[in-house]
Amino acid sequence: MKQTICGLAVLAALSSAPVFAHQEGDFIVRAGIASVVPNDSSDKVLNTQSELAVNSNTQLGLTLGYMFTDNISFEVLAATPFSHKISTSGGELGSLGDIGETKHLPPTFMVQYYFGEANSTFRPYVGAGLNYTTFFDESFNGTGTNAGLSDLKLDDSWGLAANVGFDYMLNDSWFLNASVWYANIETTATYKAGADAKSTDVEINPWVFMIAGGYKF
């Protein structure tokens, strides 16, 4: 009988023990699906009413964070390279469609504030920081080269970033996450139209939607 009572007491103590979310000194790792959805616009292309546009793409998203206090963290967003098709939109060149492609990596450095207490199961947060985007493997496809375009290059970009999200603790270590990010990404596309050097300023300014699982240690 005593053993039964002791066993029940232990179970009750365990079931009532708080699940600790993020607290000072914790490292936080998340991995999941990140979708980049551009909110793009550009200068007019080649003296027409057409603009350059960039499509959406989904890749593996990763974040690594460190809790300086129970409520404040520093976090880095990373991902596998995003691939985007570049197209013409509207005006005289809109019918060309996809004319090229590029890849980019968008490491983003954030300071985040977590609401609630260290033992809260649900931890919403907001953040602000700086995005760096580097473009690579830029090229025109057959449609672009047939239109006389060549030598595509996109400048790297620095810009402000912000996000909101939440973590939901499953136990003391594992949790689920959902977040939305916004980054100010502006670049200049340089290229040749025939033998003439051209440039077009492009604002990509994407929303990034991420669903992830996480682990803290």
Curated annotation (Swiss-Prot):
Q: What is the lineage of its organism?
A: Bacteria, Pseudomonadati, Pseudomonadota, Gammaproteobacteria, Vibrionales
Pfam families (alphabetical): OmpW
InterPro entries attached here?
OMP/PagP_b-brl (IPR011250), OMPW (IPR005618)
Biological processes annotated in GO: transmembrane transport
UniProt lists the family membership as follows: Belongs to the OmpW/AlkL family.
UniProt protein name: Outer membrane protein W
* Keyword terms of this UniProt record: Cell outer membrane, Membrane, Signal, Transmembrane, Transmembrane beta strand
PANTHER family reported in the protein's UniProt record: OUTER MEMBRANE PROTEIN W, PTHR36920
Keyword flag Transmembrane: yes
The species this protein belongs to is Vibrio cholerae serotype O1 (strain ATCC 39315 / El Tor Inaba N16961)
Instruction: Write down the superkingdom of origin.
Output: Bacteria
Q: Where in the cell is it found?
A: Cell outer membrane
Q: Please tell me whether the keyword Transmembrane helix is annotated for this protein.
A: no
Signal sequence bounds: 1-21
Q: Which GO terms describe its cellular component?
A: cell outer membrane; membrane
Which gene underlies this protein?
ompW
Main localisation, per the record? membrane
